[in-house]
Design a protein with these regions (language model features):
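Hydrophobic alpha-helical membrane-insertion segments, chiefly the h-region
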Residues: 19-29
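Ser/Thr/Pro/Gly-rich low-complexity linker/stalk segments immediately outside membranes or between
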Residues: 29-47
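Short acidic-hydrophobic surface loop/beta-edge motif
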Residues: 36, 46-50, 56-58, 87-88, ...
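Low-complexity, Ser/Thr/Pro/Gly-rich disordered linker/stalk regions
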Residues: 37-39, 43, 93, 100-347
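Short linear proline/tyrosine/threonine-rich motifs used for host-factor recruitment
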Residues: 54-58, 62-65, 71-76, 84-89, ...
Length: 347
């Protein structure tokens, strides 16, 4: 019986070796299939070097330069056909198409919100007011599936807030009787950031547009949020775009993409964001993937930033998303609270 066991063991060993060899060959073939010849420069959307490695973006796919005449696939950053699949135009109006139902929603190039006539976050969500989602990322819901699941349960009336909150409030208002209150716990050491924000994905801004944003913010004493506003494209991985950040207590811009260009106030005359009172932030972005873009920032009527530089990740990108509130909380161990009121975005 021992020889039978030995023969069986040897047969299994042979099978495993063949299986391993087959897997190895499949991996090699796949790797070969996922490389392409070096394309013409006119087809390259982005060329960037990171930690000694050069990358090229071609038709939405990111490649590593493996040799002077060969690119190796790294990952897909966006679907090159996203525009055709998700947008249609009729009588001059651009519509966003729900690919599951076929329903069309008119995109917006103008949105104003004072948060009046709303007592719950669910009353702000929908095509009528133009907001499409809210994000509650915390230690209780650190991953995307977890906070999406919580959001859906809140929208269905099956759950209440767990810790982070986004809701209309009468506690502190700029005008009227309501403002948006955003409250976020600090992120845990394993999290990049926490969030408590309101967003829409019905915008439509493209290269060449001038996008104006205005909002009133009240930050109480305590934790300071990292970002107050994000203008993003959700069609590209990681949702790159322009954002208003707070660095060393002062407002600044960053294009969250590739080398992350930043636009700061002059150091000698830097004006901090006030705490404990309302402050008005107004911004204008001239959209371009080239250095001829432009950013401007006013705080309480005073122009603090006016610089040229890249403001769009890619020439064909569509800024479809505006996120307001605590779009990122990364500073310190304290919770952060932000009140937002009288928000507007337009061309």
């Amino acid at each position: 019986m021992g020889w039978i066991r030995r023969r069986t063991w040897m047969a299994w060993l042979g099978f495993l070796l063949l299986l391993a060899a087959g897997v190895f060959l499949v991996v090699i073939v796949r790797r070969q299939q996922r490389s392409i010849p070096m394309p013409d420069e006119s087809m390259v959307e982005l060329a960037v070097e990171h930690e000694g490695t050069t990358y090229r973006l071609v038709n939405g796919d990111l490649y590593r330069v493996a040799s002077p005449d060969r690119l190796v696939f790294v990952e897909k950053l966006y679907d090159k056909d996203f525009r055709e699949k998700n947008y249609t135009k009729q009588d001059g109006q651009v519509f966003r198409v729900d690919t599951d139902t076929g329903k069309r929603y008119p995109t917006r190039r103008h949105l104003e919100e004072g948060f009046e006539n709303a007592d719950q976050i669910t009353e702000l969500i929908g095509a009528g007011r133009g907001w499409t989602a809210f994000t509650l990322q915390s230690s209780s819901t650190p991953s995307v599936p977890e906070y999406v699941r919580l959001r859906n349960r809140i929208l269905r009336g099956e759950s209440k807030f767990v810790d982070n909150r986004v809701e209309p409030s009468s506690e502190i208002v700029h005008t009227g009787t309501r403002a948006l209150k955003c409250y976020s716990l600090p992120p845990t050491p394993k999290m990049i950031c926490a969030k408590a924000s309101l967003s829409t994905e019905l915008l439509y801004f493209v290269k060449g547009d001038d996008v104006w944003f205005s909002g009133w913010y009240f930050i109480p004493e305590g934790g300071m949020p990292f970002t107050l506003m994000d203008l993003e494209t959700t069609w590209v991985k990681e949702h790159p775009g322009m954002r208003i950040m707070i660095e060393d207590g002062a407002a600044m811009f960053e294009l969250k993409w590739a080398t992350k260009p930043k636009y700061r106030q002059p150091k000698a005359s830097r004006v901090r964001i006030p705490v404990g009172r309302w402050v008005h932030l107004k911004a204008c972005f001239h959209l371009s993937e080239m250095p001829d873009g432009r950013v401007r920032l006013w705080q309480d009527g005073d122009k603090l930033i006016d610089q040229q530089g890249q403001t769009l990740p890619l020439a064909g990108a569509i800024y479809d998303s505006l996120e307001i509130g605590i779009s990122a909380h990364s500073f310190g161990p304290n919770p952060a609270t932000v009140y937002v009121d009288d928000v507007a975005i337009s061309d």
